[in-house]
């Protein structure tokens, strides 16, 4: 097995893009990241590829394992064609440790992430915990029976009177209160600057939001789904996500993709009613300091 660490995003992109595209919906995060890095237009925050860890494991014929970490975020992994190879995985772990790369966490298809975590934790002499069990869904057609409520429109700067609170609420729901207390006006404006954040209004009152967060070759990603607690249980999230998903399909994408937290059965049920179908389970694992 050969461990190759890359310093050039364009080289890494050329070697791995087609492999990741074999499971495009599953790989929306690493694919989206290497597209951002390859374009090089946006180097804010974690998007500067000069700070990334990028590696592949190959045998005599081909790449067996692809790894990319957009520091300081988690490591993401893809076993080519979802064929987990324990020797390849341990070669990656050995290469990471030899090169003194520190991994805060890993997020990947469940069985692969668990294999990596076990090997990495043992060899580092550290502990790990499961941060989130997730499911990846894709949709090719919106259920026409979903009721349409109110009006869905693009968010504007005028919405900054409430959007920071909604985004903090979203972060709190997804990542916990400890990671939802920060944030600046510039950060919130950035999250709506690409004109893909949508607001559902009912009788002129903003009640829910969702965003088309990434464009890939044939799929777009729906995320940042949030309804304030006061407005929950009224069908707003269902209507908003259905409308935004249809916007994505209308733009020419063949599928919409989203991640869900398996600890929230209500949201999983909502998405399946809209027409989303599960394609694989993903897990996020965090490591203790080593």
List each language-model region with its residue ranges:
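Conserved donor-binding loop and adjoining core beta-sheet/short helix segment
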Residues: 4-7, 18, 24, 32-99, ...
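Conserved GNAT acetyl-CoA-binding A-motif
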Residues: 100-110, 248-260
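Conserved active-site alpha-helix within GNAT-family acetyltransferase domains
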Residues: 112-130, 238, 263-280
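A conserved beta-strand-loop-helix scaffold within acyl/acetyltransferase catalytic domains
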Residues: 35, 69-72, 179-226
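Short amphipathic alpha-helix that is part of the acyltransferase structural core
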Residues: 1-31, 142-177
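Conserved beta-strand-loop-alpha-helix junction that forms the acyl-donor binding cleft
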Residues: 107-113, 258-268, 285-290
């Amino acid at each position: 097995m050969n461990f190759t660490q890359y310093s050039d995003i364009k080289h890494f992109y050329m070697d791995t893009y087609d492999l990741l595209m074999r499971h495009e919906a599953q790989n929306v995060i690493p694919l989206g990241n290497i597209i951002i890095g390859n374009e090089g237009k946006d180097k804010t925050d974690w998007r500067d590829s000069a700070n990334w860890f990028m590696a592949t494991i190959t045998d005599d014929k081909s790449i067996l394992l692809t790894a990319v970490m957009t520091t300081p975020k988690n490591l993401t992994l893809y076993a080519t064609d979802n064929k987990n190879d324990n020797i390849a995985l341990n070669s990656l772990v050995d290469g990471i440790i030899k090169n003194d790369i520190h991994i805060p966490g890993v997020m990947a298809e469940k069985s692969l992430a668990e294999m990596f975590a076990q090997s990495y934790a043992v060899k580092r002499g550290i502990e790990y915990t499961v941060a989130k069990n997730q499911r990846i869904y894709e949709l090719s057609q919106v259920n026409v029976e979903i009721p349409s409520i109110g009006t869905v429109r693009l968010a504007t700067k005028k919405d900054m009177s409430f959007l920071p609170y909604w985004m903090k609420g979203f972060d709190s729901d997804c990542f916990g209160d400890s990671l939802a207390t920060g944030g600046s006006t510039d950060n919130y404006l950035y999250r709506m600057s690409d004109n893909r954040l949508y607001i559902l209004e009912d009788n002129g009152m903003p009640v829910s939001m969702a965003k088309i967060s990434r464009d890939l070759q044939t799929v777009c990603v729906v995320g940042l789904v949030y309804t304030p607690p006061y407005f929950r249980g009224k069908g707003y999230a269902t209507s908003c996500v259905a409308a935004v998903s249809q916007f994505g399909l209308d733009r020419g994408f063949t599928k919409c993709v989203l991640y869900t937290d398996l600890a929230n059965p209500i949201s999983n049920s909502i998405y399946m009613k809209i027409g989303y179908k599960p394609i694989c389970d993903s897990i996020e694992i965090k490591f203790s300091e080593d």
